[in-house]
Amino acid sequence: DFHCLPGWSAYDQYCYRVFNEPKNWEDAERFCAKQADSGHLVSIETMGEADFVAQLISENIQSEKHYVWIGLKVQNKEQQCSSEWSDGSSVTYENLIKLYMRKCGALEQESGFRKWINLGCIQLNPFVCKFPPQ
């Protein structure tokens, strides 16, 4: 038997919490890591966990929020570009493309926070953290 910290909810050996303060994906992931050892944006590995997380969000979210970050990120492994042009000038616009690519995962309100959707990582959204009990 294990216990989560006050304010956190337990499901299947993990602790979960919804945070309403909007952050971009990277900041949300960093925030989760600071909450506890092995803390991350939530991973959803079973249908039961998906139902639990959807319920938790529905009970804790501010109603006008449409998306909630989860720990899903599209990694571009095959695009290993060098970071400067052959004339030595630095690559600046490549970062802009990355910022606006829809690479980060969220749950959407219209599906009752069950359907995954890809959003631009710089969007500010509430998020769910998950960690194994300490």
UniProtKB/Swiss-Prot annotation:
Subcellular location(s) per record: Secreted
Domain C-type lectin span(s) in chain numbering: 1-134
SUPFAM superfamilies: C-type lectin-like
Record has Disulfide bond as a keyword: yes
InterPro entries in alphabetical order: C-type_lectin-like (IPR001304), C-type_lectin-like/link_sf (IPR016186), C-type_lectin/snaclec_domain (IPR050111), C-type_lectin_CS (IPR018378), CTDL_fold (IPR016187)
Gene Ontology terms, MF aspect: toxin activity
Domain of life: Eukaryota
Cellular component, GO, one term: extracellular region
Keyword Acyltransferase: no
Tissue specificity field: Expressed by the venom gland.
Principal subcellular localization: secreted
Signal peptide annotation: none
Protein keywords: Disulfide bond, Hemostasis impairing toxin, Platelet aggregation activating toxin, Secreted, Toxin
Any Pfam family: Lectin_C
Cysteine pairings via disulfide bonds: 4-15, 32-129, 104-121
Sequence similarity: Belongs to the snaclec family.
Role according to the record: Potent platelet activator that aggregates platelets via both GPIbalpha (GP1BA) and GPVI (GP6). Induces a tyrosine phosphorylation profile in platelets that resembles this produced by collagen, involving the time dependent tyrosine phosphorylation of Fc receptor gamma chain (FCGR1A), phospholipase Cgamma2 (PLCG2), and LAT.
Subunit structure, interactors included: Heterotetramer of the subunits alpha, alpha', beta and beta'; disulfide-linked.
Protein name: Snaclec alboaggregin-A subunit alpha'
Species of the source: Trimeresurus albolabris
